[in-house]
């Protein structure tokens, strides 16, 4: 680890402890509203993560989907995440939904991104080690979390997913966001990127560059779908769910 990151370690440890407390409170609030919520807690020496863990109702599970919501989102968010929560177990997938990450608005861009990577990497490894996940493991990540996970896949993330689905990926710092563009199309696993006109403006601002990069690289593992007229209504959410399930089947999952 470089010297510029060593100075961040005490801050990262403090923030991670704060995140765990906030995430636990959010799950308890959801559980009070939904008493049948199936929660599972994973613990290590310095990390505790509580997740929603739903097993498929089918006799032959297809694998495990891990959903990583964006900030201020959760398993019951009234858009695509909630629709996936309801439909994926019926389609044969065991489902784990992580709590959304928390960040502080006054962080410098470099510190924020490093903190996001550290938190997400630690959570991912803990779930992989203790979750007894049925393979293949598919990651569905949303918004800024999707961009952070994609960056980790280009670095040293162990126990990588078999495939990833990215929903409106962006980084809150625009310069960092632009720097990650070239990474999206150069994937070594099946990768589906879904972007709509209702996603973050940064995701929209670079859509043409992403399309051009996809054409230039001609990577058969990378697929992108952009929907200019997409709306977050029930029929569109169902359409997106069917698009995801169809893509998974096309790739042999």
Which residue stretches match the model-derived regions?
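N-terminal signal peptide c-region/cleavage motif recognized by signal peptidases
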Residues: 18-20
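N-terminal cap/lid segment of alpha/beta-hydrolase-fold proteins
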Residues: 24-58
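Short, surface-exposed "cap/lid" segments of acyl-processing enzymes
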Residues: 56-93
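Alpha/beta-hydrolase active-site loop
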Residues: 106-132
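Residue in the alpha/beta-hydrolase core beta-strand immediately N-terminal to the catalytic nucleophile
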Residues: 136-139, 163-165
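Gly/Ala-rich beta-loop-alpha elbow adjacent to hydrolase catalytic centers
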Residues: 140-150
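The feature captures the conserved acid-bearing segment of alpha/beta-hydrolase catalytic domains
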Residues: 158, 163, 168-223, 227
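C-terminal catalytic histidine-bearing segment of alpha/beta-hydrolase fold enzymes
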Residues: 218-253
């Amino acid at each position: 680890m470089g010297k510029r990151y060593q100075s961040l370690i005490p801050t990262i440890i403090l923030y991670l402890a704060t995140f765990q407390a906030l995430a636990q409170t959010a799950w308890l609030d959801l559980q009070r509203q939904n008493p049948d919520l199936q929660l599972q807690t994973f613990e290590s020496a310095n990390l505790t993560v509580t997740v929603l863990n739903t097993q498929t109702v089918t006799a032959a599970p297809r694998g495990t989907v891990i959903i990583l919501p964006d900030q201020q989102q959760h398993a019951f968010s009234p858009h695509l995440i909630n629709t996936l929560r309801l439909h994926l177990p019926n389609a044969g997938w065991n489902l784990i939904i992580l709590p959304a990450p928390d960040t502080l608005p006054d962080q410098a861009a470099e510190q924020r991104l490093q903190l996001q990577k550290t938190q997400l990497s630690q959570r991912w490894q803990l779930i992989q080690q203790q979750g007894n996940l049925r393979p293949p493991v598919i990651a569905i990540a949303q918004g800024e979390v999707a961009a952070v996970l994609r960056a980790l896949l280009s670095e040293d993330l162990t126990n990588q997913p078999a495939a990833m689905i990215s929903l409106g990926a962006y980084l809150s710092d625009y310069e960092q966001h632009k720097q990650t563009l070239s990474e999206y199309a150069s994937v070594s696993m099946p990768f589906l990127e879904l972007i709509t006109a209702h996603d973050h403006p940064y995701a929209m601002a670079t859509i043409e560059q992403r399309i051009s990069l996809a054409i230039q690289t001609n990577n058969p593992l990378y697929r992108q779908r952009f929907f200019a007229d997409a709306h977050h209504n029930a029929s569109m959410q169902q359409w997106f769910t069917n698009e995801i399930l169809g893509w998974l089947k096309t790739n042999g999952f």
